[in-house]
Each structure stands twice: as structure tokens, then as C-alpha cells.
């Protein structure tokens, strides 16, 4: 099965260094989802998501104030999805015959190409939930990060009730995400392993591991790897 995905996964990584320095959690998250710098990448970001031996090509694009991703088991009949940035409803839409249709609650949590990533994960829609709370600073992989808690608004669909996000204090890129259920059980963890510079003071994801967990035992069930290539204009610089 050969699949191609246009997704917004790395969009919240892109930010200016100054935005991440503010100790206000709303400002930190706003900086983490800034997209203006993505317009500097005319061809977007290309890479892949891989689970086991199956690899799915991925490409990230920004269309004005909309982030879009495309998934298709058949390259000739792609399915296109989008979310408008700053939309307080946090809804994802599928474009069918030129018209936007809401994704159902079940579709939001459906896996993409058999991986640990869902449509909810690809859009990182929880970054748009209101009233984030700063819980302090912690190191992630030896890197100083702000730890932010985001609670799901009432009557909002999705698996996660509480999401914790660790944002790099210097680069402004998120370094780790943990999604929990209503009982506090860990459902999924996103662990960034490397970032890269794509423009002046703009950093984005190079490599990340996404792991699904058993919320009762905390045991890791399965893993998906996400990797992006360096743009031609980028001068990559890893964390380690």
C-alpha cells in the first residue's frame, strides 16, 4: 500500500525564538503554532511516517490560514483534510467535491495508514484548546523546556482529556507531548528526538517517535517513527 499524506503535524513546531521565552503559557503555545515562517518553504517539508516495515511518504503545506493534509491509499483519488488556524471550534474538515464536511468524532481518532497517528494527532488540534496552564520547567532529553497543561473543553470530541506539552525554552519547538484519559491514564506520547533549523530563528521537527500506551498499566503497546528531510535552504543542527 503506497500512501501519501499532506499533514499539519509539524506546524506547531515552527516558531520564533522570542515567542518561546515568554513565561505566559498562552504566548508559548501561540508561538509554537505560528505558521508565517512556513511560507518561506515554497515546496513544504517532505518526510515519512513508519510503523514496522510500512513507510508512508508525508509532505507538509500551509495554504493561507489553513493547514492541510492529504491521505490516499490510491494516489489517483486522494482524500484532502484541512483545519483553519485560530478556529475556536478546533474542527477538522474533509474536502469532498469542493465542499468541506466535518469529520465525525469516530473519524478523528481513526489511525492513519495503520500507524499510531490519528487525524486528531496529525492536526495537533489540542494546541488550540483555551486556557493553557504553565506548570513549571523540566528537562526533556537534557533540554530545558516549559511544561504546559491543556484541558479539553466541555463537549469537545477526541480521546484526550488532558494534554501536557513540553516546549523548548530556547528554540520554541515542542519536545514532548503526553495525552491522558479522564482517569489520568497515559494514552499516547510524542517524543521529539531531533529538530532542525529551516530559517533564521525558525526550528522544526526532524525526527519524532510516537508511542501508544495501555492507560491501565502504562505499558507501551506500539511505536511509529516520524521523520522529515532538511529543506534545501536549511542548515540542519541537531540537539545532540
Features from the language model and the residues they span:
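Bacterial N-terminal signal peptides that target proteins for export
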Residues: 1-7
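Bacterial N-terminal signal peptides
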Residues: 8-17
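N-terminal cleavable signal peptides for secretion/export
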Residues: 18-62
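Flexible, processing/modification-adjacent segments and terminal tails
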Residues: 21-31, 37-41, 86-161, 237-240
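Ribonuclease/tRNase effector modules and their secretory precursors
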Residues: 47-48, 70, 81-86, 95, ...
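Short hydrophobic/aromatic-rich beta-strand segments that constitute the beta-sheet cores
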Residues: 67-71, 89-94, 102, 174-179, ...
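Gly/Pro-enriched, hydrophobic low-complexity segments
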Residues: 144-238
